[in-house]
């Protein structure tokens, strides 16, 4: 039986911090798998585990075709062969197929071999179609890949990759992704993209990734095959990539190449190391240049691994802080082709908006003209226009232009920084209710202002800002200090439930979860049976049963589509239940 779980813990842009568990072993994503060549170990798997790499990838085809490795792997298993107790993923020989045109093994043979040697995550023998291949070849390769996927699905007894192919034809990528999503696989790599990255065709890479993501199930992690340079991590994660692999740490080291988050330097160019990893803290560039080749290669490989790990941590911290777009913007300026890819990504507004959180831990900073195209800005402008029809009194915002006056206390309008300051005016007692009604219309959708038309709004004695919202002695909502949006009380939730037709704002849970939700307990993904597809990450939602009876209110971590798909992890952090 396959033991595999994936859940989302935090998110920003289309990126996410997740927890992946396979066979009782856990890693946090985004994660990178250092590539291990069992014939040539620059850094041992055991050392990689000590450095914090909880997952590695090696090539099952090389092991299969090397008699001594094959015999030992069959005898003791791949974990003992490599002396590594973390998660081991394997490729199938597809890379050799793309590079050299052929492999001497069948799909069934390699899948069965992977299971026999005890890998954690296997890969069937897909056909990687290189970029710009003739359409007919891409279609035929994909037909064979999907046939092999079906065969692998029928015989597999381990967690398995199902790679999305289709060359540089977006429609084929989306088609492949949809077909594979219908099958029983655990992870979806996006394959045959190394040639795009090697030739700096990052703009085309964006098209391939987004086309694939649009067809894939959102509850499965996505692996960008062959992507291991830190300069691309922020952009790739913002697109929705969860897993990477890198042979570059060792291959570059052999050529005296030194990785940085902004690009690659040759050791001969460096007088100073711009890094404080254990290698760069101990040696100077000159000292490394004077070392024997083998020792120098090993130390450069270690540095490259440290900088890869550091950049992934930087990306994860940016997600936690709601700053991933700022990091993407910064990294994109390290190369013109990466900058072009960043601009291309911002053209996919529909895809990005569905994954963009409704609120963030950090203020919006206008750091570039491109930042005005971030989905949080585009959404805010669109919603403000809708609110303006009901609350026509406007003020001029230096970043967002003309906005309804009564949204001026709320995210992202109040929590933003540009070249010019935006002065926030404290609301007067006579108009403070309008602020609440306008924010409801902005946050919950058209018509929801009616739920607060008789509200009494308490102002903070300290700041003069709206805080508690009540009506007829009952608590409706809280006007949050951190972002000027509303957290619903159960009475406010009841009013919205009466106003809004099903399924708006709803998360429907099954009978098992119902008594817990009523008592204010969190809702987990496996108990969700339906949801409003317009729900966005960190939205306030109404939790109901199959009969649309209100059970609770809370904040969701997932968007509407994800709520219906995920089977692991937290779905809604419940704030109030009808019985508590």
Swiss-Prot record:
The processes (GO biological process) annotated in the record are: tRNA wobble guanine modification
Residues in PUA domain copies: 504-579
Under which main EC class is this enzyme filed? transferase
GO CC entries: cytoplasm
What residues does substrate bind to? 126, 192
Cofactor(s) required for function per UniProt = Zn(2+)
Q: What is its EC number?
A: 2.4.2.48
Question: Is the keyword Transferase assigned to this protein?
Answer: yes
Tell me which domain of life the UniProt entry assigns to the organism this sequence originates from.
Archaea
Active site per database record: 91 (nucleophile)
Catalyzes what? guanosine(15) in tRNA + 7-cyano-7-deazaguanine = 7-cyano-7-carbaguanosine(15) in tRNA + guanine
Its biological purpose is as follows:
Exchanges the guanine residue with 7-cyano-7-deazaguanine (preQ0) at position 15 in the dihydrouridine loop (D-loop) of archaeal tRNAs.
So what family is this one in? Belongs to the archaeosine tRNA-ribosyltransferase family.
Q: What's the protein name?
A: tRNA-guanine(15) transglycosylase
Q: What is the lineage of its organism?
A: Archaea, Methanobacteriati, Methanobacteriota, Thermococci, Thermococcales
Q: Which gene encodes it?
A: tgtA
